[in-house]
Design a protein with these regions (language model features):
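Beta-sandwich/jellyroll recognition modules and their flexible linkers
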Residues: 1-164
Length: 164
């Protein structure tokens, strides 16, 4: 489960944290009701991750997804899906979750491995979300074995959108 943590936030007093557990899991952190007001919305955040990876193989990781009624009918798609139109400016996904892993994200690009501390991620959310009220979610998934410290996300900012 994602929790509010005060242990190692980038900025006080807290951040969002999810551990990388040693069992199959699929955990989400949603932000509902983001109204996109621009044709060039941008999202930025700081993230610090240490997820299971061994010998260059990514076993656990997390992604950013969006649900937009006029694009996906409410289904969640990756922020980089062509229908969404988003792209990373910096700090994008680091590897593909192994396709043989018993991980709900198997075969998908994700943030995985060890970031070595907080890094900046900047995303051009693309023009396709303009005029829609969307739900954004971070989705962390793990395979059946080996725990790691987990994921911290802090300082989320979205321009070209309003959040109630």
């Amino acid at each position: 489960m994602w929790v509010t943590s005060t242990v190692t936030p980038e900025t006080a007093p807290n951040d969002a944290f999810v551990p990388d557990q040693d069992g199959i899991s699929d955990k989400v952190l949603d932000r509902m009701g983001v109204t996109v007001t621009s044709t060039s919305p941008m999202m930025s955040f700081r993230n610090n991750f240490n997820t299971e990876m061994s010998m260059g193989i990514f076993w656990d990781g997390y992604v950013l997804e969006v649900s937009a009624p006029m694009i996906s009918g409410g289904a969640f798609l990756d922020i980089t899906d062509p229908h969404v139109g988003g792209s990373f400016v910096s700090g994008g996904y680091t590897g593909e979750i192994d396709s043989t892993a018993m991980n709900p994200l198997a075969g998908r690009m994700a943030w995985s491995g060890n970031s070595g501390g907080y890094i900046d991620t900047v995303i051009n959310m693309g023009p396709n979300l303009a005029g829609q009220t969307v739900t954004l979610r971070f989705r962390m998934a793990t395979d059946a074995a080996v725990a790691a410290p987990g994921v911290h996300i802090d300082n989320i900012s979205i321009t070209g959108a309003s959040c109630p």
